Amino acid sequence: MDGTDAEAPGQTAPSRAESLVAHAEASISEDALLAAARERAVDIGAGAVTPAVGALLSLLTKLSGGKAIAEVGTGAGVSGLWLLSGMSDDGVLTTIDIEPEYLRLAKQAFAEAGIGPSRTRLIGGRAQEVLTRLADESYDLVFIDADPIDQPDYVVEGVRLLRPGGVIVVHRAALGGRAGDPAARDAEVVAVREAARLIAEDERLTPALVPLGDGILAAVRD
């Protein structure tokens, strides 16, 4: 048997998994613009994807074609910068958040990165309402990083927006492991499990769960 997958002496399976995630995070470096956006996110208490999650977003965006991207949950622009890094030069990021201050800081982050206003569309409001106004099958990638309670609604709308071959990406899909705990049955866990069920049972989608951040559930549409 190949020994490369064997646990190191004295290392349990959970600690090995944690070490792998830590290594993945440490392997990604962020430039000064991302670091500044992340610092502003911390200052205002806005969530921000980890560097490894950001790198994965950039990769998936590039693989999807990266011309039209929709984001639910702008934050201070950290994830937006990562998404834009994988987009084509003429691609447009549509990002939605209910918090005006988050949108202001994201706009600042994009401007500091030299991203022209024609490349981004920042929309304030409840995502459930805004998403219904976006056109069917018009997006290469939809990234959901908002209140887990509303994940099922966002997944339904997000899949509708995807063109064939497009990718939906859901952050906080494992809630740091709580979603996989049979004893956990709070409202967030129930909602996240329902979102995962919707994706798993949609025959148009091919999904995979990636153990980065609070869990990344990604699926490509046939």
Curated annotation (Swiss-Prot):
What residue range is the signal peptide?
none
Recorded hits in Gene3D superfamilies, A to Z, give:
Vaccinia Virus protein VP39
- Write the Enzyme Commission number(s) for this entry: 2.1.1.-
Where on this chain does S-adenosyl-L-methionine bind?
V49, E71, G73, T74, S79, D97, I98, D147
The record's Pfam families line, in alphabetical order, gives: Methyltransf_3
Matching entries from InterPro entries are given as:
Cation-dep_OMT, SAM-dependent_MTases_sf, SAM_O-MeTrfase
**PROSITE patterns this protein is in?**
SAM_OMT_I (PS51682)
Q: Which domain of life is it from?
A: Bacteria
In this entry, which stretches build a coiled coil? none
Q: Which residues bind substrate?
A: D145
The molecular function terms in GO held by this entry are: O-methyltransferase activity; S-adenosylmethionine-dependent methyltransferase activity
GO biological process: any one?
methylation
What's its top-level EC category?
Answer: transferase
Which keywords belong to this entry?
Methyltransferase, S-adenosyl-L-methionine, Transferase
Q: Tell me its family.
A: Belongs to the class I-like SAM-binding methyltransferase superfamily. Cation-dependent O-methyltransferase family.
Protein name, UniProt field: Putative O-methyltransferase MAV_1364
Species this protein is from: Mycobacterium avium (strain 104)
